[in-house]
Amino acid sequence: MIENRKHLGLAKIGFLCLVVVIWIIPFAASAQEVAVGQATATVQAVLAVTSVQDLNFGNVLQGVPSSADIDVVAEAADFSVTGSGGAEVALYLQLPEYLWNSTNTDRMQISFSSTDCEIDANIGTAATKVAPVVADPYNLPATALHATNNILHVYLAGTVYPAVDQAVGAYSADIVLTAAYTGN
């Protein structure tokens, strides 16, 4: 019997502890609050770089330097860059030092001055530029794409120097424009 009383006493104490715990838990929980935040990101449009027009010197004479005019559509190189409107892009031109004939047996010197490049963040052509900015083709500034048209154009001119004994034929070289978002 004493043993039953001990168990009954322990059961009462256990029950009281359970009641106290159940009574305290709501008060402890009310001292906390929860807030939910979100992580967000917006992926910008992919940049697309297109060669609209090649740099074209036309027919040149042996020993006579020839320049392409940056304002003539048929002569000036025209690259378009499209992407997320208003986003800033870093631009880099990889320019050749020589044009090579089709058999790679003769080359012609080509050069670019610090004023042979223009950047215009508008829709247009070399002849209809809206607000061109003169730029050094070896050190192009970061430029924002047009906010609503999502575009900019890079125009390029240059000069070739045929030798007096330049081999007859067509000459060419690659001009590469690289564009990348700056995050600004």
Please place each PLM-identified region on the residue numbering:
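Short N-terminal leader segment in a subset of presequences, especially plant chloroplast
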Residues: G9-K12, E118-D120
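Short stretches within intrinsically disordered, low-complexity N-terminal or propeptide regions
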Residues: I13, I70, A76, Y92, ...
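N-terminal secretory signal peptides that target proteins for export/translocation
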Residues: M1-L10
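Intrinsic disorder/low-complexity segments
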Residues: F27-S30, A48, G124, T128
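N-terminal small/polar-rich segments of proteins
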Residues: S30-Q109, L140-N184
